[in-house]
Amino acid sequence: MKKTGLVLALLCCVSLLFLSVASGARAQGDQFYKGKTITIVIGSTAGGFYDRWARLFGRYMGKYIPGNPEFVAQNMAGAASVIATNHVYNVAKPDGLTVVMPLNGVYIDQIVGRSQVQFDLRKFSWIGSPSIEPSIMYMRSDAPYKSIEDIVKAKVAPKCGGSGTSSTDFILSSILEEMVGAKITSVLGYPGGTEIDLAVEKNEVVCRSHSVSAHFGREPFDTWHKKGFDRHLIQTGRKRDARAPDAPTLLEVFERHKVPEDSRRVARMLLAAGELGRPMMVTPGTPPERVKILREAYVKVLNDPKARDEAKRSRMDIEPTSGEELEALIKDIFDAPPELIARAKKVLTN
């Protein structure tokens, strides 16, 4: 009995010590964020869906973080958000006060070894993503290309706008060129989606690829659709979106062109950006208890009735992915066989 009592006493002491440490960590978190400001660095220009989501989180996350910090949004567009990601990786302190929302294809630039990349995405702590984002390619309706087959047969390649080599615009165009023989001229360097859409209106370029949710969720597309300004050529979702029933899926096009499985695996890796959605990450080295606080607040925002209503009114779809799931996806991407990564590099550098 004495031995049993001693064991119980020791267990109680250990439990109390654990609770004390946990409470202390939470108290430190409470104390740390009080009176502080968290900066959300956005890897694109104002007005697009990345910007919208960042500002929505900025309006709601503070009330779910102990100490109720303020949030500010900072747009840092350029090089398909490589500039923003470099900044948060190399300049921002690892204190939980700076998060970044880069374009979801930013991992591509690291995979292919672009010289501008000064980060390792595997070292970030991933907070979450509000939605999964399949893509769609649109074309000016007055351009002489009514389908992907027209682009394959084209004597003059259409010009498609993009922000950089990790943008959906460039990735999907490169896949179509390499795997089905499409002819596309990518015009890169636009700061963000808003500028590409303006270039399409000016007829500087005639096509663009971006998320389905943005294409059916904001201007100028609402007006374009009413006027018949654009048509839809292809989409990357598993099935056709009800809003674009005329556009075949990439899988359908692959079937038609008998694209082999090894090429399809490369395409899946390059289009994993859609699974990443619109991710938020925090500086590498941020204390785990602060990462936990940010992740919990992120989830609570996506369950907040007012935040959900605001997202719905703005036609921003909610299909969240946790930070842990995003980290696992990034690990899978970078753990791909060397031959698969080599083929991906070939697709994007041809």
Question: Where do the protein language model's features map onto the residues?
Answer:
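Bacterial N-terminal signal peptides
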Residues: A9-S20
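Sec/Tat signal peptide C-region and signal peptidase I cleavage site
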Residues: V21-A27
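An extracytoplasmic/periplasmic, membrane-proximal ligand-sensing/linker region
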Residues: K34-K36, H225-G228, L233, E255-R256, ...
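Hinge/capping helix and adjacent helix->loop/strand transition within the periplasmic-binding protein
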Residues: I38, K63-N68, H87-T98, V106-E204, ...
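Extracytoplasmic "Venus flytrap"
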Residues: T39-A54, A77-A80, G161-T168
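A ligand-binding cleft/hinge motif common to bilobed small-molecule-binding domains
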Residues: N104-Q116, F170, S174-M179, K202, ...
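Short beta-strand->loop
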Residues: D120-P130, K183-G189, P220-A273, S322, ...
